[in-house]
């Protein structure tokens, strides 16, 4: 709808994504808020004109499937949208019941669900100290081809926050230590890492490459 595609990305990352999608025949149209879908879903009318389509993907979010569970009968509270209400240790309003994953209304990422598991595991067999408040940097993945995964600060965010950093960026095709993209014939993309110059701590990373959704865990 806006003037820039994927506006939260650093310019160099966005340019790499746009180039990859364009090479694959994807046409990206900006400033095109949709006003109507016509012809049984075969035509999209927008501020940038009309487009004939084979299919229309309507991505308006998700809602929890909790209505049929009769959770109030078990003493489990939900919010106005149907998500299960939990505290920072993922405890519900019912004693001895936890809620993990998308159903508790947190960020709907696989990485968050995995950390939910760690929190509940700590409640059951650990020292019960781990909580959602411990989360510092949560990875995210945009599932395009190849996937685009990120964690921590982008270069733009570091600049806006006045954080000192060193940055390294390299096209995947030029990284000899990553043979898998070459093996699969998918060498599009880049890897970009920000590092604190004083401590060598990784401040953030962007991986636009084959298996990025898995590789990002090595950084996170």
State what each model feature region is:
Residues 1-40, 108-114, 120-157:
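Rossmann-like dinucleotide-binding cores of NAD(P)H-dependent redox enzymes
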Residues 13-17, 47, 183-186:
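Short, hinge-like loop/turn segments at secondary-structure boundaries
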Residues 23, 79, 86-88, 155, ...:
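Short, acidic, Ser/Thr-enriched surface-loop or helix-capping motifs
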Residues 28, 43, 50-127, 217-218:
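FAD-site-proximal beta/loop scaffold in flavoenzymes
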Residues 36, 75, 89, 192-194:
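Short, surface-exposed charged micro-motifs
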Residues 39-44, 164:
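Short, hydrophobic/aromatic-rich segments at coil-to-beta transitions
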Residues 47-50, 199-201:
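Short acidic/polar mixed-charge low-complexity motifs
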Residues 143-220:
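Flexible, glycine-rich terminal cap/loop adjacent to redox cofactors
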């Amino acid at each position: 709808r806006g003037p820039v595609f994927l506006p939260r990305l650093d310019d160099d990352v966005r340019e790499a994504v746009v180039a990859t999608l364009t090479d694959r025949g994807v046409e990206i149209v900006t400033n095109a808020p949709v006003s109507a879908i016509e012809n049984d879903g075969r035509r999209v009318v927008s501020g940038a004109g009309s487009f004939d389509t084979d299919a229309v993907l309507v991505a308006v979010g998700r809602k929890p499937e909790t209505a049929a569970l009769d959770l109030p009968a078990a003493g489990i509270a939900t919010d106005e949208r149907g998500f299960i209400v939990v505290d920072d240790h993922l405890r519900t309003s019912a004693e001895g019941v936890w809620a993990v994953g998308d159903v508790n209304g947190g960020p709907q990422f696989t990485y968050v669900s995995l950390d939910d598991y760690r929190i509940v595991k700590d409640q059951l067999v650990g020292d019960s100290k781990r909580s959602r408040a411990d989360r510092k940097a949560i990875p995210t993945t945009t599932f395009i081809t190849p996937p685009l995964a990120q964690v921590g600060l982008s270069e733009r965010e570091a600049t806006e926050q006045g954080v000192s950093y060193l940055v390294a960026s390299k096209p995947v095709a030029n990284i000899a230590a990553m043979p898998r993209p070459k093996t699969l014939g998918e060498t599009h993309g880049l890897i970009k890492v920000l590092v604190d110059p004083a401590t060598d701590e990784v401040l953030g990373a962007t991986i636009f490459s084959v298996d990025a959704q898995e590789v990002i865990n090595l950084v996170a």
